[in-house]
A protein has these predicted regions:
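Soluble extramembrane regions of membrane proteins in the secretory/endomembrane system
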Residues: 1-37
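A general, composition-driven signal for non-globular sequence regions
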Residues: 5, 19-21, 26, 60, ...
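Non-transmembrane, membrane-proximal soluble domains of secreted or membrane proteins
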Residues: 10, 37-73, 93-274
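Alpha-helical transmembrane segments
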Residues: 71-96
Length: 274
């Protein structure tokens, strides 16, 4: 675990450069005098997830597809059960409705039926648990070898992003720091360490790091350093959202995830070191 830097260390403004390989417009960060940490107007320009059918498009080459498959499998199972139960209710309402001359019948239960509707859901739940555990292990297990290390320190109301410099170590003079701007190359795993540092390094609160298109959501808990990983399938610019209410400015705690070619990412790193 690394020591969380004070929020005052992160004072940056933005300028736009173009990734020549992909044509993607990305944000480069440069130091500026200490002032307002986050421009409210920037929240209006953050790309929103595009919804196709039930979910935004999956851009994760790792576990995103498996998460979607679980969602749809559970949706189909619960839909079949819902339709079956509602159909049975309607059938019984019609078949056993009150009619002139009809006598009510009484039953003390049916052991066979009791076993069936107890064991069947139990089998379904065990089956879903096994499938979910496999996906959970892939998400929460160790990140793939060669993953790019990045640290993100959450505060009210910004994502402070930190990359190691040429020495490969964090919290040294050559670190690269940005605010609300996460840059990664396409097709390469990224390991992100999440911490909550609080405003000006004081009174950290709970946040939640959310990348809808990558099926990644992780609570950022004060006092804990939590690792997550993901891998992008294509270039583009996407939203970094906080999905946990963290104060009155929660609505503007949004950032950019810029994904570009390996050449473009290296050009961006070079731009930061210049």
């Amino acid at each position: 675990m690394s020591d969380a830097p004070a929020a005052a260390d992160f004072k940056f403004s933005s300028k736009e450069i173009v990734d020549e390989a992909s044509g993607l417009k990305i944000k480069a960060s440069e130091p500026k005098p200490a002032g307002k940490l986050f421009d409210d107007s920037a929240a209006l320009n953050v790309p929103r997830p595009k919804m196709y059918w039930w979910l935004p498009p999956n851009l994760s080459t790792g576990y995103g597809r498996k998460i979607d498959q679980l969602f749809y499998l559970i949706l189909w199972i619960t839909s079949v059960i819902f339709v079956g139960v509602q159909g049975a209710l309607l059938l019984f309402l019609f078949r056993y409705r009150a009619r002139p001359g009809a006598k009510a019948t009484y039953t003390h239960g049916n052991n066979r039926l009791e076993i069936i509707w107890t064991v069947t859901p139990a089998i379904i739940l065990v089956f879903l648990t096994i499938l979910s555990q496999n996906v959970w292990s892939q998400i929460k297990g160790s990140s793939p070898s060669g993953a790019i290390p990045i640290e993100i320190h959450a505060e009210q109301f910004a994502w402070n992003v930190q990359y190691p410099g040429p020495d490969g170590k964090f919290n040294t003079a050559d670190d690269i720091k940005t605010i609300n701007q996460l840059h990664i190359p396409v097709g390469k795993p990224v390991r992100v360490r999440l911490t909550s540092i609080g405003k000006d390094g004081k009174h950290p609160v709970l946040h939640s790091f959310f990348l809808p298109e990558f099926r990644l959501r992780q609570d950022v808990v004060p006092g804990m350093a939590i690792d997550v990983w993901f891998e992008a399938a294509r270039t583009g610019q996407y939203e970094i959202a906080c999905s946990q209410f963290c104060g009155l400015g929660h609505y503007r705690m949004r950032g950019y995830l810029s994904i570009h070619s390996q050449e473009g990412f290296e050009a961006w790193l070079k731009e930061q070191k210049a």
